[in-house]
UniProtKB/Swiss-Prot annotation:
<dbReference type="GO" id="GO:0046872">
    <property type="term" value="F:metal ion binding"/>
</dbReference>
<feature type="active site" description="Nucleophile">
    <location>
        <position position="307"/>
    </location>
</feature>
<feature type="disulfide bond">
    <location>
        <begin position="315"/>
        <end position="341"/>
    </location>
</feature>
<keyword id="KW-0464">Manganese</keyword>
<keyword id="KW-0732">Signal</keyword>
<dbReference type="InterPro" id="IPR050386">
    <property type="entry name" value="Glycosyl_hydrolase_5"/>
</dbReference>
<keyword id="KW-0326">Glycosidase</keyword>
<dbReference type="GO" id="GO:0071555">
    <property type="term" value="P:cell wall organization"/>
</dbReference>
<dbReference type="GO" id="GO:0009986">
    <property type="term" value="C:cell surface"/>
</dbReference>
<dbReference type="GO" id="GO:0009251">
    <property type="term" value="P:glucan catabolic process"/>
</dbReference>
<keyword id="KW-0964">Secreted</keyword>
<protein>
    <recommendedName>
        <fullName>Probable glucan 1,3-beta-glucosidase A</fullName>
        <ecNumber>3.2.1.58</ecNumber>
    </recommendedName>
</protein>
<keyword id="KW-0624">Polysaccharide degradation</keyword>
<dbReference type="InterPro" id="IPR017853">
    <property type="entry name" value="Glycoside_hydrolase_SF"/>
</dbReference>
<comment type="subunit">
    <text>Monomer.</text>
</comment>
<comment type="similarity">
    <text>Belongs to the glycosyl hydrolase 5 (cellulase A) family.</text>
</comment>
<keyword id="KW-0961">Cell wall biogenesis/degradation</keyword>
Length: 415
């Protein structure tokens, strides 16, 4: 027999259930399980090439569009919306599944960063196709089941914030012209309202990926956009972390801005896109990684290295852009030849030489040491169609990425 207290509790529970079920799930704040980005170490991976396409991650998709398809905009433009939607829907449903999230968790990760473009929310009168949010919804459920945290990353903004193919549209930077910033705020707000209530899983959101200040993005206007983003997040879930790109400036240059606002600086570090860094031997690569780790310690805010990789060259097919040659083989103007790409163009890391495999493992370990000296890291990327050094799933399978990520074959190289 139930006591009066038990009966009262059951009535209250029933009423709570009715009221909860009356609220749409996407508007409901789940039990808060926020991450303290000041003190906790982020260990994670990006799901690149899934909901935002890049030719080097999934070259087979771009083969459908011929030479004119150099980014997601032109791919959809060439194919037309119906064919593009059919191809992309198949890709979205198969490239990343629950099994990937399980593998990521089993490898010792605690976060995934999921890039998504503004066109998933709204792209009127543009070639893009939508439908990505259904799969992003699935990803939140998969992360919950696997015990992973999610950071939503607005990877592409109207007009392109950097001119790179990974923004959705390669070419001139037109972000901050016309109504592009207002449209970006609208897209960000729609994503925040949809996903930040899932606060047991979605613990952070990124304002915009890689706004290119050296390439022409106005820093003052970028800060104004960031201020609007912070207001949006605080109105929905003030416990959520807000990742702000450094815009390719030193992270310390942002000191004094938005302190106490749950802000995390996002910096990206690649060696193969710099003519000096690409020329280094493995010992110098390790030193450079450790020096970068020391540099980011100068920030007065948490810093997560939101993109980095194990590749030491730009040999991967289409990495510099669709059908663009490599610096490493001296095919750029004023770029000396550093070596032969060989098996570094495509395939598995198992096809690399023994020395290349050893160098890859050592470089990855050095970066882990360096970035955990601040607040952590998110590797780019989880899966590709065959990009040696870039594919965490493949690196794990071949023993080139530490599992767990604290395992070391080379000791602490930044000590």
């Amino acid at each position: 027999m139930l006591s009066r207290l038990s009966q009262t509790a059951l009535v209250a529970l029933s009423l709570m259930t009715v009221l909860t079920e009356a609220v749409p799930s996407r508007m409901r704040i789940q039990t808060r399980d926020s991450v303290n980005y000041q003190s906790e170490i982020v260990r994670g991976v990006n799901l690149g090439g899934w909901l935002v396409l890049e030719p080097w991650i999934t070259p087979s998709i771009f083969e459908n569009g011929g030479g004119a398809a150099v980014d997601e905009w032109t791919l959809a433009e060439v194919l037309g919306k119906d064919k593009a939607r059919a191809i992309l829907s198949q890709h979205w449903s198969s490239f990343i599944t629950q099994d990937d999230f399980n593998q990521i968790a089993q490898a010792g990760m605690n976060h995934v960063r999921i890039p998504v473009g503004y066109w998933a929310v709204s792209a009127p009168d543009e070639p893009y196709v939508d439908g990505q949010l259904e799969f992003l919804d699935n990803a939140i459920s998969w992360a919950r089941a696997a015990g992973l945290k999610v950071m939503i990353d607005l990877h592409g903004a109207p007009g392109s914030q950097n001119g790179f193919d990974n923004s959705g549209r390669k070419g001139p930077i037109a972000w901050q012209q016309g109504d592009t910033v207002a449209r970006t705020v609208d897209a960000f707000k729609a994503l925040a309202e949809r996903y930040l209530p899932e606060s047991d899983v979605v613990t952070a959101i990124e304002a915009v990926n890689e706004p290119n200040i050296p390439g022409g993005v106005n820093e003052g206007q970028l800060k104004e956009y960031y201020n609007q983003v912070l207001e949006v997040v605080h109105s929905i879930n003030p416990d959520a972390g807000v990742f702000l790109s450094d815009g390719f400036l030193a992270t310390a240059s942002w000191n004094g801005y938005a302190n106490g606002e749950n802000v995390v600086m996002d910096t990206h570090h690649y060696h193969m896109f710099d003519n000096t860094l690409i020329s280094l031997d493995i010992n110098a690569h390790v030193r450079a990684a450790c020096e970068f780790g020391n540099q980011i310690k100068g920030s007065d805010k948490p810093v997560v290295v939101g993109e980095w990789t194990g590749a030491l060259t730009d040999c991967t097919k289409h990495l510099n852009g669709k059908d663009i040659p490599t610096r490493y083989e001296g095919q750029w103007a004023n770029s000396p030849r550093y070596g032969d790409c060989g098996n570094k163009r495509q395939g598995s890391s198992s096809g690399l030489s023994e020395q290349e495999r050893s160098d890859t493992r050592r470089f990855i370990e050095a970066q882990l040491d360096a970035y955990e000296g601040k607040n952590g890291w998110l590797f780019w990327t989880w899966k590709t169609e065959g990009a040696p050094g870039w594919d965490m799933q493949d690196l794990l399978a071949n023993g080139l990425f530490p599992n767990p990520p604290t395992e070391r074959q080379y000791g602490n190289q930044c000590a």
